[in-house]
């Protein structure tokens, strides 16, 4: 039973994203350990590429992981902590007490992290449009065709599923009738705006993916003997 429950906990962790990189903490190898006791206590230890990763990003990941694991059926308690970080004690204590970011860093933080999460989700949506549209551009689709496309017109793919999910999180149109190319406010991109919009989307995607590769490299350097051991 504990093996099945651990698998369920791991699947829950698959839904927890690094907000800046838009990748699951499991894929990024940020999960140091994940165990579940016979009485249903799930213990998860997260790690990050550097000792000084931003506290706000770090707090989001630990808090999201705690919420995701706590929601797994059969888990009676979730102990989720962050190791080897300059603010580990504050983050771990704040998440355990469900104090929120402001309550945890009362002398430094003035706002909760909802707006930060929204900013990075917006970037993920922009980058996702490039991932989905790029094969169409490479196949010869022009601005008029791209501006007219809906999500239902696009071949199914993991990138399309991810784009729909991120749009849903932001309250943006994400059904089959929704335009493929959207501005951040949900308005359709016109054919005249397509080249500049896709240029911005491509640069955003490249920036996110480059940062992701840097983080993976830093993690391997920091934990050369402990990568992929969770």
Ranges and model annotations:
Residues 1-51, 56-230:
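Domain-level signature for proteins that mediate thiol-based redox and metal-cofactor handling
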């Amino acid at each position: 039973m504990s093996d099945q429950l651990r698998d369920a906990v791991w699947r829950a962790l698959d839904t927890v994203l690094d907000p800046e990189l838009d990748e699951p903490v499991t894929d990024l190898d940020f999960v140091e350990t994940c165990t579940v006791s016979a009485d249903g206590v799930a213990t998860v230890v997260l790690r990050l590429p550097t000792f000084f990763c931003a506290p706000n990003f770090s707090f989001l990941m630990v808090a999201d992981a705690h919420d995701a694991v706590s929601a797994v059926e059969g888990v009676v308690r979730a102990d989720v902590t962050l190791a080897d970080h300059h603010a580990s004690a504050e983050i771990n204590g704040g998440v355990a007490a469900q104090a929120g970011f402001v309550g945890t860093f009362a002398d430094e933080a003035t706002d909760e992290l909802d707006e930060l999460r929204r900013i990075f989700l917006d970037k993920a949506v922009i980058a996702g449009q490039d991932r989905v549209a790029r094969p169409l551009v490479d196949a010869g689709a022009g601005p008029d065709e791209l501006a007219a496309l809906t999500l239902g017109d696009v071949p199914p793919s993991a990138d399309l599923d991810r784009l729909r999910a991120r749009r849903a999180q932001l309250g943006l149109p994400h059904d089959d009738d929704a335009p493929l190319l959207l501005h951040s406010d949900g308005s359709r991109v016109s054919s005249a705006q397509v080249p500049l919009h896709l240029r911005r989307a491509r640069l955003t995607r490249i920036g996110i993916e480059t940062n992701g590769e840097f983080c993976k490299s830093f993690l391997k350097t920091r934990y050369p003997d402990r990568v992929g051991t969770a």
